[in-house]
Amino acid sequence: MEKIGFGGGCHWCTEGVFQALRGVVQVDQGFLQSEPPWDAWAEGVIVTFDPAIIQPGILAEVHLRTHSASGTYSPEGRYRSAVYVFDDEQHDEAARTIAQFASDTGEPARTAVLAFVGFRGSEERYRNYYQTDPSRPFCRRYIDPKLAYIRQHFADLALP
């Protein structure tokens, strides 16, 4: 098993997206930290995955296509578009995936590839937000469209 981190807007959404993929064993929701100037805690998830089923580059592509990867984020902000990597191989694969995304969309991808430094878990009541009650208005409005996108564009990796 391997781990990789993602940040991109609300961690409830990010958690729900990765929980919907084959090969993802666990998603830990909370706040991630990198090196300066990205050392402020920001919402995100740590994804534990089986690389025999799903590669880090595919996880990064799913991430890029299910949040505002071309948006502007502040290093000090609570939200940031980022891939938090645990080694050089993940760094290179994430950078290639982001460059390909920018080429495919014709938009600048402002998603940063950052070294993982730290993680603080969310309060228990916020964990598994989508899975505990997918009928919540927030889930229906923001997470359901992302899951529909996964089922349409990553059908072979989408859980039923």
Features from the language model and the residues they span:
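Flexible coil/turn and secondary-structure edge motifs
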Residues: 1-160
